[in-house]
Amino acid sequence: QTFQIPVTSDPDAIIRDATIYLFAVNDGAVSELASLIQRPQALNIHCAGSQSTQLTAASGNRNAVIWPIYSITKTTQPLESIPLIVDGNSPEAIELAQQLALAVSDNVRTLNFEQRKYLHLNAVLVNNFANHLMAIAEQVSREHQIDFEILMPIINQTAQRIKDQSPQQLQTGPAKRNDTATMAAHLELLSAHPEWQEGYQSLSASI
C-alpha cells in the first residue's frame, strides 16, 4: 500500500504545519529533529522500540510509538502480518497511532514502555544474537571449506519447530546432555578465536 505523504531526509524541508510527524530515523537523531519542529498540535510518532514516547517531547506533548518487530531494509520490505507495537502518552495518541498502524499491518499490539523494553531485549536475543551465531558458523564453514548451505535445513527446522513447542522443551545438544567431552572438543576447535570460546562457554552454562 502506498501512502500519498511527503517524505524527506532534509531538516530544512520539513513541513511545519503537518498534523502528524513520523520520525523514521536513527534513535539518536529523533530528539534533535523533534526540537526543530516544535508543533504542539501535531502527533509525533517515532519507531524506536526501546525508547519512551517522550523521545519526541521537544516538538510537543502528543507523542506516540509505532515499532515494527522486523528488520526492515531497502531490499526487504515488511509483510502485512508483521507485528506493529503501538504506545502513546495519552489515550488519544494511542488511538491515532493504532489507526495508522492498522493501515499497514493486520497485526497491531499495544504495549506500555516497560513491556516494550523487554520485548526489545527479546528481539535482540532472537534476531541479532542468533544472526551473530550464524555468522560465526558461516566463517567457520568458510575457513574449513564447508558449504554453509548444508546448515540451512536445521536452521529452518529450528525456526519452524518453535511455532508449536516451547524452545526450552526443544533444547538439545551437548550442553543439555552435560556432554563435557564434546564441549571440550568444540572449545579446542575454537582456540583461534578466544572470544568465540567465551561465548560458547557462557551459552553452554546458561543451557
PLM regions: where:
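Internal alpha-helical scaffold of NAD(P)-dependent oxidoreductase catalytic cores
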Residues: 2-6, 78-163
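Interdomain hinge/lid region at the active-site interface
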Residues: 158-207
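Short alpha-helical
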Residues: 28-29, 51, 91-92, 116, ...
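Predominantly flavin-linked oxidoreductase catalytic cores and closely associated redox partners
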Residues: 62, 69-78, 89-90, 140-143, ...
